């Protein structure tokens, strides 16, 4: 389970990452853009994306995926004080991604770009505490998926 300071840091940083739907779409596009740029091999998991989507994530399907991911992350942040719910969400996330052939190692690649994502998405307003809290949450999700 996450510590109280980590939970607070997640909630605080979430306001910067997902203030509204437009911000959530922008955050999703940025996160996946960083993933695809850093790890082009991850594109194999997104068979329904075309070159334009991979280039900018600024297509209907790209925006929809980014929004879905950030809606899911929002569920974790919103329920972060309820360990049973967080664990249930982690198991659901794992089931959904296992069915698509996405491994814990694939999640680790996303985790690897997350600090850069936080810097870029927040205009460098993400603190070390924010970064550590997201790293702890992602580590927990990876563990649930292993």
From Swiss-Prot:
The UniProt record lists the keyword Acetylation: yes
The UniProt record lists the keyword Transport: yes
Disulphide bond pairs: none
GO CC annotations on file: extracellular region; hemoglobin complex
Superkingdom, taxonomy of origin: Eukaryota
MF term (GO), any: heme binding
Family: Belongs to the globin family.
Pfam short name (any one): Globin
Residues found modified as N-acetylalanine: 1
Alphabetized PROSITE patterns for the sequence: GLOBIN
Gene3D superfamilies xrefs: Globins (1.10.490.10)
Binding, heme b: 65, 97
Record keywords, A-Z: Acetylation, Heme, Iron, Metal-binding, Muscle protein, Oxygen transport, Transport
Alphabetized InterPro entries for the sequence: Erythrocruorin, Globin, Globin-like_sf, Globin/Proto, Mb-like_M
Name this polypeptide is given: Globin
Assembly information from the UniProt record: Homodimer.
Start and end residues of each Globin domain: 1-146
